[in-house]
Amino acid sequence: MIKPILVFGYGNLSRGDDALGPLLLDYIEKHCDLSKIELLTDFQLQIEHALDLEHRTLVLIVDASVACINRCDFSPLTAARDKSYTTHAMSPAAVLAVYVSIKKQAPPPCFLMSIKAESMELGAGLSSAAENNLQQACLFVKQLLQQPTLNHWLQQTSY
């Protein structure tokens, strides 16, 4: 049976702050009720991940980002066919566009949690700033998952 909520964290544990997405999933696994939540992780988003959106009521995609304005940015996603559409590493919006293309319907409500990163050097550990940002993101996502409704999540997008 497919669980209604998908949390997809992507990144590389061997590349410093790029590990933020998978590390947030580790936190969720230890501190949240997973009865309605499926956790999925990978190094990067790929075309096949569009099928993971099927039969979901809410989707949260989590990634590290050096472009964050805040320590963590939380926003709704819309499908958009961008230049990553034809590459091996896709943007979250492009994955949603693939879903629309193959399923001929709108994707479930999807949100992006970007966690501010500083360095993604191969072999590096998590920076202290990223560790602090991860702690803040974990607390925020925990409260999101305690109220997994579209209305509640939309109200949190000013975070």
Q: Can you annotate each of these PLM segments?
A:
Residues M1-A117, A124-Q136, K142-Y159:
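N-terminal catalytic or cofactor-binding beta/alpha core of small enzyme domains
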